[in-house]
Amino acid sequence: MASTTTCTRFTDEYQLFEELGKGAFSVVRRCMKIPTGQEYAAKIINTKKLSARDHQKLEREARICRLLKHPNIVRLHDSISEEGFHYLVFDLVTGGELFEDIVAREYYSEADASHCIQQILESVNHCHLNGIVHRDLKPENLLLASKSKGAAVKLADFGLAIEVQGDQQAWFGFAGTPGYLSPEVLRKDPYGKPVDMWACGVILYILLVGYPPFWDEDQHRLYQQIKAGAYDFPSPEWDTVTPEAKDLINKMLTINPAKRITASEALKHPWICQRSTVASMMHRQETVDCLKKFNARRKLKGAILTTMLATRNFSAKSLLKKPDGVKKRKSSSSVQMMESTESSNTTIEDEDVKARKQEIIKVTEQLIEAINNGDFEAYTKICDPGLTAFEPEALGNLVEGMDFHRFYFENALSKSNKPIHTIILNPHVHLVGDDAACIAYIRLTQYMDGSGMPKTMQSEETRVWHRRDGKWQNVHFHRSGSPTVPIN
């Protein structure tokens, strides 16, 4: 009988030290590779607590991080799965957050801001060249390699990152941190790489004056500002900023993603590549002072969130009222944890699941509307050509393809001039990974019979949906109860 061997490679090769940070299902600890003495940061995920979707997200994060090798990105060195735990071994970044370092400097100018955003753009460009969209660019995820002067800026936390094909635009779910979300995400439009460039525009704006371009305690009003692109360059603080810097911000904060500047284009902008002659060298004390207040607000919100998480006395709605994004801090160590804690992930996950379920209900309603209207063309656009079905009209047989359904559309549904109204009751949606879902519901159909009397039919339906190229298609349904076509 063959025996199964449990992997113990992490336990054998690495020694664990103090905790650097903590999330819902993971902890980050300093570790050392025993054979070399090299220090790293280990993100330790308790896989026993993960759902199937969480497992998929973990695999995606590891796959993405393995792909990205750049001096301005926190590097994944190892990914090891052991019994009950998964270990992601990252660079040990000890310089803390970029924004915290800036406020500790004696001198900070527009040219320094240019150098910071250049490194961020280099990391984003590398991601985009490799078909990766980060989706959560914000100050908390911009770290410094060390405490040394001139240490490299490192982009961290790829927990929300996605893989895209070329310039593909699709709906990948509602993800990000409120103040850095792009208009297209808020509109629930298909999106892609340009969302990262919008976030870069928000970050650059903050780097120059110490406060964000979009701000409101009320989240709905904040989102309205973002969708309208309602920002400006108020006096007096913007009077000393060069026109070239403002031009780059305008190109990044362009509402239309198709017209928004790309990372490679931004790196060629004069304010970036001709910094020494274009960017101002004047010390910006007002920016430093404002940035201190901005950082303090973020830390306060982080402390409040930590308390809420500890007591579990929180709701998705309360978490969504944090436009800056927040971080949970568990360690007094100077070492920075390189994962976003539950600040954005809880918010996004709750919002993402809710939005995706609503999407399935909406597309199901569209399909039923096509049936009621006798619109076979609209029906075929929503259904897979190989659609399988169990329905009363088929007398218990499994039917495949469109021909069986075409008969009813052409000979009954399209020729009916009776008013029909359908209600979906108690819809239950099960999300199966990122690209599949199942919905079960009661369907009530109201119509007028041949004698002009109102009638109601009831059926119980289950539909299976699969997303291809960003579009949901019905691949299977099972209906019991009344048939589709109202009987006189």
UniProtKB/Swiss-Prot annotation:
Residues bearing the modification Phosphothreonine: 287, 306-307, 341, 346-347
Modified residues (N-acetylalanine): 2
GO molecular function, one term: calmodulin binding
Keyword line: Acetylation, ATP-binding, Calmodulin-binding, Cell membrane, Kinase, Membrane, Nucleotide-binding, Phosphoprotein, Sarcoplasmic reticulum, Serine/threonine-protein kinase, Transferase
Control of this protein's activity: Activated by Ca(2+)/calmodulin. Binding of calmodulin results in conformational change that relieves intrasteric autoinhibition and allows autophosphorylation of Thr-287 which turns the kinase in a constitutively active form and confers to the kinase a Ca(2+)-independent activity.
Region spans: Disordered: 325-350
CDD domains recorded: STKc_CaMKII (cd14086)
Any GO CC annotation of this UniProt entry: neuron projection
Subcellular location, record wording: Cell membrane, Sarcolemma; Sarcoplasmic reticulum membrane
Family matches, as InterPro entries: Ca/CaM-dep_prot_kinase-assoc, Kinase-like_dom_sf, NTF2-like_dom_sf, Prot_kinase_dom, Protein_kinase_ATP_BS, Ser/Thr_kinase_AS
GO biological process, one term: protein phosphorylation
Region (Calmodulin-binding): 291-301
Topology of this chain in the membrane: Peripheral membrane protein
Post-translational modification: Autophosphorylation of Thr-287 following activation by Ca(2+)/calmodulin. Phosphorylation of Thr-287 locks the kinase into an activated state.
UniProt-listed Enzyme Commission number(s): 2.7.11.17
Domain notes: The CAMK2 protein kinases contain a unique C-terminal subunit association domain responsible for oligomerization.
Subunit-level organization: CAMK2 is composed of 4 different chains: alpha (CAMK2A), beta (CAMK2B), gamma (CAMK2G), and delta (CAMK2D). The different isoforms assemble into homo- or heteromultimeric holoenzymes composed of 12 subunits with two hexameric rings stacked one on top of the other. Interacts with RRAD and CACNB2.
The protein's name: Calcium/calmodulin-dependent protein kinase type II subunit delta
Organism: Bos taurus (Bovine)
Lineage: Eukaryota, Metazoa, Chordata, Craniata, Vertebrata
Gene name for this UniProt entry: CAMK2D
